[in-house]
């Protein structure tokens, strides 16, 4: 029994990336060797997607309400330039993702029998739908997966509880922690679920499906590379008026590489703090901006949400006009700020963005499952971009403030 327990503990504490890779390889091998065997394990993928579908609405509602209710009062005003950079950078990432999706449209191999989309006519219908989703009954919003309504009621409850007693806030913080633990447990089952998903995908659609995933992954990585090597340096140059690349490459090397392998912005906070100290930044500033950046500076997440959502829209045959794409950029940017600290957080917020286009929760969750399949690389690159940008923008704001003082 002890041996079994230790084996389970080793599996639970092992590298999720390696386990997912094993699941993908095992699924491909099974589909190659035995098509019937691959089809028989498809239920593992369905169970995994079902668990995600069940927990996601509760997760969004509780996390949003708890984070707003427990927000610190009297935040330092000298954080404003950095916060503006964080938000602008996240929105820029979403816009970059929209442009990449328009230039290199992607479609996915999804099962569309279960639910069909009712595509919106344009921005007017999208806004009309959005307004009525906002005022949906909160219980119904959770039951039906109406993420716009969930987000609205979560924000409303969080604001209402912002002035509540500390004990009430602590209850919400504890519930939020509990839900996050449940999500982590479900994510630990990802290798088994992905094994079932990959087996079923290759058994039913053949190996042509991987071409779609490779195209999607290349578009995602290209958008993140453009953000890291072109957009971020341009933003930094605007602030510091000198060559930004020495700073950018230092941050990518010393923060981005570590974050790529840890796949956690929160886990990379100590690394970023040490880098800020090495860069001789103001401790009073970076001690606040780095943890804040791990929460709201989510350019990589905005790219993931936008590209996967537009891939879903393309797959469903929905024509996306420019104004709707801009609205998606805003929604993706705001949603990305809520992706922090949640395992697979950016993927679980895809249904919220998909709801803008009338895409059903069933189809959206299949897109989330595709995200988990490519997540071995996508999530690592996303975290590397997010975390390194925290230091880049903090350093740029500090240098700009110093230059202004010395002028």
UniProtKB/Swiss-Prot annotation:
> Which Pfam family, any one of them, does this sequence belong to?
SDF
**Reactions listed under catalytic activity:** L-serine(in) + Na(+)(in) = L-serine(out) + Na(+)(out); L-threonine(in) + Na(+)(in) = L-threonine(out) + Na(+)(out)
| Residues that span the membrane, as ranges | 14-34, 48-68, 82-102, 141-161, 192-212, 216-236, 290-310, 316-336, 363-383
The membrane topology noted for this protein in its Swiss-Prot or TrEMBL record is:
Multi-pass membrane protein
| Record's function text | Involved in the import of serine and threonine into the cell, with the concomitant import of sodium (symport system).
Its localization reads: Cell inner membrane
Q: What is this protein called?
A: Serine/threonine transporter SstT
Family of the protein in this entry: Belongs to the dicarboxylate/amino acid:cation symporter (DAACS) (TC 2.A.23) family.
Organism from which the protein derives: Shewanella halifaxensis (strain HAW-EB4)
Please, one GO biological process term?
serine transport
Keyword Membrane appears in the UniProt entry: yes
């Amino acid at each position: 029994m002890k041996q079994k327990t230790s084996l389970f503990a080793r599996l639970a504490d092992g590298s999720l990336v390696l386990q997912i890779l094993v699941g993908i390889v095992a699924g491909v091998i099974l589909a190659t060797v035995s098509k019937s065997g691959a089809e028989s394990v498809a239920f593992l993928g369905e169970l995994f997607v079902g668990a995600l579908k069940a927990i996601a609405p509760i997760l969004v509602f509780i996390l949003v309400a708890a984070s707003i209710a427990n927000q610190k009062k009297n935040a330092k005003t000298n954080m404003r330039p950095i916060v503006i950079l964080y938000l602008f950078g996240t929105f820029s990432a979403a816009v970059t993702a929209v442009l990449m999706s328009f230039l290199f449209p992607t479609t996915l191999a999804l099962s569309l029998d279960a639910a069909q989309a009712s595509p919106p006519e344009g921005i007017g219908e999208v806004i009309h739908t959005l307004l009525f989703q906002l005022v949906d009954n909160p219980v119904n919003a959770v039951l039906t997966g109406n993420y716009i309504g969930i987000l609205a009621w979560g924000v409303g409850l969080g604001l209402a509880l912002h002035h509540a007693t500390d004990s009430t806030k602590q209850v919400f913080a504890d519930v939020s922690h509990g839900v996050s633990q449940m999500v982590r447990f479900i994510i630990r089952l990802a290798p088994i679920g992905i094994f079932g998903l990959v087996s079923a995908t290759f058994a039913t659609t053949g190996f042509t499906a991987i071409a779609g995933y490779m195209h999607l992954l290349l578009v995602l990585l290209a958008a993140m590379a453009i953000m890291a090597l072109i957009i971020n340096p341009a933003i930094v140059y605007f602030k510091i008026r000198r060559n930004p690349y020495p700073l950018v490459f230092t941050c990518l090397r010393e923060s981005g590489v570590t974050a790529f392998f840890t796949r956690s912005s929160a886990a990379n906070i100590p690394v970023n703090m040490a880098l800020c100290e090495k860069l001789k930044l103001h401790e009073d500033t970076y001690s606040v901006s780095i943890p804040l950046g791990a929460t709201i500076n989510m350019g990589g997440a905005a790219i993931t949400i936008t590209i996967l959502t537009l891939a879903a829209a393309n797959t469903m045959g929905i024509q996306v006009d420019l104004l709707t794409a801009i609205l998606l950029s805003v929604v993706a940017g705001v949603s990305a700020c809520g992706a922090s600290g949640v395992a697979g957080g950016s993927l679980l917020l895809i249904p919220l963005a998909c709801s803008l286009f009338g895409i059903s929760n069933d189809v959206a969750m299949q897109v989330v499952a595709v995200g988990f399949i490519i997540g071995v690389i996508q999530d690592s690159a996303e975290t590397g971009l997010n975390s390194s940008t925290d230091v880049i923008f903090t350093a740029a704001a500090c240098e700009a403030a110093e230059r202004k003082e010395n002028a």
